[in-house]
Structure formats: C-alpha cells, structure tokens
C-alpha cells in the first residue's frame, strides 16, 4: 500500500485537515490510514488521532481554538470505547 499525504485547506489557504491515505484497490476512493490532524482557522490544532483502513482507532485528542485540550478518548474500529474526558476552554475538567 502506497501512502500519500492529503492537505485540505480553508478558503484562506491555511491547512484545515492533513492526513495520510491510500487509494482503494478499485481506484475509486481514498482511504485514510495513519495520522489525522485537523486545525482551527487560527492555526491551532483542533483534533489529532489515527485511522486504520478508514476507521478511527486508538487515542484521539480534540482541542479548543485557544489550544487547551477539549476531549480525550479512545476509538476501536471506529467506535468510541471506554471513558472519555472533557475540558472547558479555560482548562477546567468537566465531569464525564
């Protein structure tokens, strides 16, 4: 499988999404595989996690536009599993 990096931009040209992907065997669609990152319009990291053959897998982190951690949890085969934790933009942890 040959991976390449996709950069999807906001209208401003700044990176909105960056992820690795490969072309499906039938050549008709791209499948995310590996690190996925999303960014807020201000350039701060919005989300980071991994895909395995097109589905979320492993630890994911979401961030507020100010850079504070917003959420943390695990995916297994594209489904949220276990306890997820959440934080307010000021960094205070919310109840789960």
Task: Identify the residue ranges that each predicted region occupies.
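Glycine/tyrosine- and acidic-biased, solvent-exposed loop/turn segments at the edges of beta-strands
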Residues: 1-96
């Amino acid at each position: 499988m040959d991976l390449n990096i996709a950069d999807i931009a906001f209208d401003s040209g700044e990176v909105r999404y960056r992820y690795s992907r490969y072309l499906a065997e039938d050549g008709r669609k791209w499948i995310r595989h590996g690190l996925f990152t999303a960014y807020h319009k201000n350039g701060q990291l919005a989300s980071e996690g991994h895909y395995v053959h097109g589905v979320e897998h492993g630890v994911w982190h979401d961030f507020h536009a100010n850079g504070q951690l917003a959420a943390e949890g695990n995916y297994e085969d594209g489904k949220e599993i276990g306890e997820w934790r959440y934080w307010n933009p000021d960094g205070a942890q919310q109840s789960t």
